């Protein structure tokens, strides 16, 4: 059994499609959009379908912006093993994007979490190259905002390649729901003690002085969790002062057990150092940095 700890910077897995026509389950909404304003994350959710065919779609966001994590849950959702590839598409105008799927349960209901940071529109080839180029030692690559017009044009979501059927959800225009999600995220930033207007107009975001994956090694895998075969996904954020020093680490969401959370924050506070964020005037200011750590066991 091999152990690995990976920092989730991008999902690049590709799976081949099947030539056989696939069943498509097309579901209309059966509830309104609801935003859950939690202390360390924001979640936008809506139910689709009725009875045993009902599924609930969640957009989880841990910082303001265009990125979110998708989760879909329902009695008829197939349980997923491992970390298989999936495809996610917001139609009718946007191209499909690739994501890594992880099986989960919410209130004993099967669920799938899509890792890798989803957007309404996937990154272009040029944007992906720029992101890879900056990932090692440069400032974070910031693609152009998608904007409300493209979000409004997205009226359905297709999830494919991961179940024995494809799931087509009539979301309706996504501009207003995602705007509500971002409102929650900015309020969350305010609750961290940061100046929201200042954070909205930074000339540079905080970023690590060395590749963040170097903060972790296989030896950091909790021994008890290794023996029990436990794995985890840990979303965290770090407050960074004007000198680039981390001042607080907070777990935003985690699939637990808690031993994984403790390893993440202990390593961050001990090993992480950052280039500080810069205000609109170019002055170093307090800010935050966030990421996801995956603890995986490879058989």
Language-model segments: residues:
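Sec-dependent signal peptide recognition
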Residues: 2-8
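A short acidic/small-residue loop/turn micro-motif
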Residues: 223-224, 253-259
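Residue-level signal for well-ordered, solvent-exposed loop/turn and beta-edge residues enriched
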Residues: 34, 243-245, 283
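An ectodomain-focused feature that recognizes extracytoplasmic/extracellular
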Residues: 20-86
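Internal interaction segment
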Residues: 103-216
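Short proline/glycine- and basic residue-enriched helix-capping loop/turn segments at helix->loop/beta transitions
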Residues: 199-239, 262-299
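Extended low-complexity, serine/threonine- and proline-enriched intrinsically disordered segments
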Residues: 73-117
């Amino acid at each position: 059994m091999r152990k690995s700890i990976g920092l989730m910077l991008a999902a690049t897995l590709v799976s081949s499609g099947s030539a056989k026509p696939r069943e498509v389950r097309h579901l209309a909404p059966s509830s309104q959009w609801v935003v859950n304003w939690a202390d360390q994350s924001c979640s936008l959710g809506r139910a689709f379908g009725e009875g045993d065919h009902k599924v609930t779609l969640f957009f989880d966001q841990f910082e303001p912006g265009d990125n979110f994590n998708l989760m879909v849950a329902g009695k008829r959702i197939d349980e997923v093993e491992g970390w298989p590839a999936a495809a996610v598409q917001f139609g009718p105008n946007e191209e499909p994007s690739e994501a890594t799927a992880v099986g989960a349960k919410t209130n004993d209901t099967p669920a799938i979490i899509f890792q890798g940071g989803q957007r309404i529109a996937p990154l272009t080839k040029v944007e992906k190259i720029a992101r890879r180029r900056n990932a090692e030692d440069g400032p974070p690559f910031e693609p152009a905002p998608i904007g409300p017009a493209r979000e409004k044009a997205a009226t359905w979501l297709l999830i494919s390649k991961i179940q024995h059927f494809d799931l087509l959800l009539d979301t309706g225009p996504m501009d207003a729901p995602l705007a509500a999600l971002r409102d929650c995220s900015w309020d969350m930033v305010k609750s961290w003690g940061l100046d929201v207007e200042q954070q909205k107009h930074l000339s540079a975001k905080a970023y690590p002085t060395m590749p963040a994956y170097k903060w972790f090694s296989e030896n950091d895998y909790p021994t008890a969790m290794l023996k029990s075969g436990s794995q985890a996904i840990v979303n965290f954020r770090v407050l960074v002062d004007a000198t680039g020093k981390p001042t607080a680490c907070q777990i935003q969401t985690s699939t637990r057990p808690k031993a994984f959370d403790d390893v993440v924050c202990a390593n961050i506070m001990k090993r992480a150092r950052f280039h500080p964020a810069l205000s609109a005037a170019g002055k170093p200011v307090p800010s935050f940095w966030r990421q996801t750590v995956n603890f995986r066991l490879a058989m």
